[in-house]
Amino acid sequence: MFFTRSFFSLIPFKDTGQTDGYIATFGEDNDYLINAPSFTINDSDTVTDDNTLLMWQRQDDNTTRTWANAGTYCSSLSLGGHSDWRLPKAYDELQSIVDYGRLYNRINTTYFTNGTVSGYQYYRYWTSDIYAAPSNNLSFLIRFDSGSVEYTSTSNEYHVRCVRGPSTTRSFTDNGDSTVTDTKTGLVWQQSTSGSKKTWEVALGICEGLTLASQSDWRLPNIKELGSIVDTSEISPAIDETAFPNTISKSYWSSSPVSSTSASVTVHHLDFRAGRVLSESKSYDFWVRCVRGGQ
């Protein structure tokens, strides 16, 4: 059975950039390398992601804008000989250039300039995604100081980095064996939620030890993989419930710890009530959904 949802530019995820391990338990993000980040500088104005083939504005203009003005800015932009620029989607696009292996400034500044200025507004970049709550007037942004994905009032002013690339379609296939395949990324997902809420280390072990659909190479998804199944047009839960029925509108663990010099370990998790990426201590209890493939 096929479940197809159209989005403007679904693109394959790539590795998070996290190369450090924080605990002895196998299965955290750095234990798996998936599509290593790679970029090509086209000129002083643009850079192409070699994995997703999306072309990015290399240097933002260091100006903050409301969400509406951010969209107008991108659609009016002429850069690198192209005029089909737009505001990027949250999980499908802007999260793909977050480098979760870096401290504080989570973007590769070799390829993306203006990436070292500190300040509350500087690190927050608009996406085109609208929060699905009835009250609305809220849109998603990504914080490059933390890698978090949040929503805020569209009247706030934040930075903009425009993108260009083709439209694609997100498509899930129910394999009929309690698994779902994302035909765009090739990832195979556990269709249901595993058991009960667990601490992070226990969650890692559950996925590493899982045998499902005659396969035993399951793992806890990294934060970009987990983001690839978020549907920001939905709420409570923010996911395609036809493909993933009975998803709990709470947080699910990723395998990606927050890069830090602190002795305490915090980990990125995804709040499927609202579609947000947040972080919390590894000792918290969150839900678990395992994944395989993509390596």
Segments (PLM) and residue ranges:
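Glycine-aromatic-enriched surface loops/turns that form tight recognition elements
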Residues: M1-R86, A90-R219, I223-Q295
